[in-house]
A protein has these predicted regions:
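Small-residue-biased structural context
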Residues: 1-117
Length: 117
């Protein structure tokens, strides 16, 4: 039911998204801010979506307004992923050379590995 879906999302958030957001905010977004001027709006929007998800998880766990919250979180996460796929990743590929991309990739993997422990 709904509570199980809320619990699944909460676990997914803690097991995957916390480290994913940290990796983006500490490594990927600063690199793109420095390397590709004019994209602050997109990066700020993605960070804002991260913050919305961070703030919603405790509400999700409390069970308050669960049906609407589960729907809203699913919608927000889907929009966030689409923005990354359509705007962020192509920007990265167009402006970051393979050497720098390999270094960044290793740093992202390090942060994601830390998050899974």
């Amino acid at each position: 039911g709904l509570r199980e879906r809320a619990q699944e999302f909460s676990e997914f958030y803690r097991n995957n998204l916390v480290a994913h957001f940290r990796a983006e905010e500490e490594v990927l977004f600063p690199l793109l801010r420095d390397s590709v001027p004019g994209n602050d709006g997109m990066l700020d929007e993605l960070i804002g979506q991260h913050e919305q998800l961070r703030q919603a998880v405790p509400q999700l766990e409390s069970g308050a307004g669960l049906a609407k919250l589960v729907f809203d979180l699913g919608d927000l996460l889907e929009r966030h992923i689409r923005k990354e796929e359509r705007e962020l990743f192509p920007l990265f590929e167009a402006h970051i050379d393979s050497t720098k991309a390999a270094i960044i990739g290793a740093e992202l993997i390090r942060i994601l590995d830390e998050g899974s422990k």
